[in-house]
């Protein structure tokens, strides 16, 4: 069985602050798991990532410019190319999330956290 890879999925409207939040997270040394990271960028906003400011190395940034690129074969190839142990996805808010779930390799896991019960 292939190694299970956690996926951090960020979904929201265009210009809702996803890129800024992810950039700030990547600048935090506490987010360094020791694993290589595949950062999938599925939309172009006003801000761009600055990998020189990331707190750790081993980050492979890949652009997904069209949802037709969301295939199990393409995502598996990106996983192998990057050698990643985790995936961060800035998802396009205009695309259906189900299309991403249908395309994700079986070993990619998206843990779901709800803030409904947080105080």
Q: What kind of region is each of these model predictions?
A:
Residues 2-12, 16, 20-118:
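Nucleotide-state-sensitive switch-loop elements of NTP-binding domains
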């Amino acid at each position: 069985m292939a190694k299970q890879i956690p996926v951090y999925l960020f979904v929201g409207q265009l210009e809702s602050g996803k890129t800024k939040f992810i950039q700030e997270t990547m600048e935090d040394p506490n987010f360094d798991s020791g694993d290589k990271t595949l950062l999938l960028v599925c939309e172009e906003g006003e801000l761009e990532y600055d990998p020189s400011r990331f707190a750790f190395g081993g980050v492979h940034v890949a652009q997904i410019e069209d949802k037709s690129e969301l295939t199990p074969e393409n995502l598996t190839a990106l996983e192998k190319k990057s050698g990643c142990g985790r995936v961060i996805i800035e998802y396009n808010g205009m695309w259906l999330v189900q299309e991403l779930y249908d395309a994700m390799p079986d070993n990619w896991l998206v843990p779901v956290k709800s803030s409904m019960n947080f105080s």
